[in-house]
């Protein structure tokens, strides 16, 4: 080879060496589709090398500039964004390889290289991409990138993510750059894109205007179908009645505003609610001496009540709910095998046996209610005597809430309406119980709400007394009121954590508390039926159950019965008591029952009075 031929081939070899070196750093061009945003060719000259991008063919050509000097070669992206100020050249000394990546028409890369001298080995650019799709990135990014979810919309698939190497939080380094994504919200009524927070919920302009017209004018909307029309983006105008109903269901209300912004509302100087005052009391750790100063000084309260009130008032709603859930008694079994169909005597024997055993567990449960053991023995007995059947009934309702048409008295004692009708007078009570169970099932009663309602029944039974009533007033009435307020606050607190609107929270509280009046009415019906069956000698009654029943008939409430006092003052050790018969240890007197004209034996205490005692009247 002559000297002239070697001299002529030298530039070509240098050009080939530079191009191979460049292709070693770049990604495969066959796997990258060039963007349709740049249909024409573009030629750029940098550092003696001219690069031409053929966007239609998807190829690159490199030629040597004959007038180039021996300056350093620098490379840039061949397909820059329309706004070039968003791109930064790679600084001298950067460890990132030169990469030729065409820009995407949908997703734009943000090059976040720091100034010279501050570059780190972990620095990678950030990208925004839909989940589950491919991304334009370099080999360094593919090995070091981490994915962090930014926002998502319920029921939609377009979830946007941020990719970076700064950790799980997605926050960039001191010099990193990341584009903020606008959070996408959807209308709570029709699932269209929401334009803002209107009337208490996120909604679109159409549903916002529809609700505004509906609450301002006279809306006599009538559904032509069954009031169950589907309201979505395409069918929201098909039924105005169902659309307005759904607006109320999702929580739209007149005057609703976004809590973090406040809205256009007029501020009033109102006193804080009782719940807020109690929450402030929890954080301040209110002492018992402060509570004693607030107690009434009329002499009706017991001497040791101050500490009990302090313990109850300083208890947070979470603590109250936890204690009530832990206090729940176990589910019992009847442990008696009888062949079906049941007779009237068999059913009444099973039910009274279960009721007597549950009463024993009820006393143990009541002692675990926050503050109950701080009450006097008189008040404990009076509260239990006044509410025992209501507590048994709400427990029966809770066990039967997921079995429509049946009542679960025990795990092995499940009765339906037809079996209850075989007992005289039981059909009406069964219907009332099943209707109440259905109502609680519709409301989707939660266990936390159930334990609060059960404790409210116990404490509210003796909250009021009248001058003409033979029932003695509670001696620790202030303490009982504090206990009931604390449990009511726990119920309100739990409902407030459900995520529904304020209007729906108040409505649910009212719906739950109003059902307690139905339970009390059923307890009166059940008491009359149980007493009539007792008078007809159709069922044996147990000592504890008989004591409860006679408390409403033969004694004025307030006198502490012997059996009740023994069981409330001591922990129960047995799970059942012996039945009381009317033939051996019971002295009977004949009285006339006004309802059915039969004779009813009025039982007296079976044990003779002790020394120095007189028989009970």
From Swiss-Prot:
BP GO annotations: cellular response to estradiol stimulus; estrogen receptor signaling pathway; regulation of immune response
Pfam families: Hormone_recep (PF00104), Oest_recep (PF02159), zf-C4 (PF00105)
Main localisation: nucleus
NR LBD domain sequence ranges: 316-552
Name listed for the protein in its UniProt record: Estrogen receptor
Compartment(s) where it occurs, according to its Swiss-Prot or TrEMBL record: Nucleus
PROSITE patterns with a match to the protein in the record: NR_LBD, NUCLEAR_REC_DBD_1, NUCLEAR_REC_DBD_2
Tissues in which the protein is found: Ovary and testis.
Subunit-structure text: Binds DNA as a homodimer. Can form a heterodimer with ER-beta.
Family: Belongs to the nuclear hormone receptor family. NR3 subfamily.
GO molecular function: hormone binding; nuclear estrogen receptor activity; sequence-specific DNA binding; steroid binding; zinc ion binding
Compositionally biased spans, kind Pro residues: 606-617
Organism: Ictalurus punctatus (Channel catfish)
Ranges of compositional bias, category Low complexity: 573-591
Annotated InterPro entries: Est_rcpt/est-rel_rcp, Estr_rcpt, Estr_rcpt_N, NHR-like_dom_sf, Nucl_hrmn_rcpt_lig-bd, Nuclear_hormone_rcpt_NR3, Nuclear_hrmn_rcpt, Znf_hrmn_rcpt
SMART domains, A to Z: HOLI, ZnF_C4
Superkingdom of this protein's organism: Eukaryota
Protein's job: The steroid hormones and their receptors are involved in the regulation of eukaryotic gene expression and affect cellular proliferation and differentiation in target tissues.
Region (Modulating) residue spans: 1-186
DNA-binding region, residues: 187-252
Region (Disordered): 1-54, 269-303, 568-617
Residues passing through the membrane, by range: none
Gene Ontology CC entries for this record: nucleus
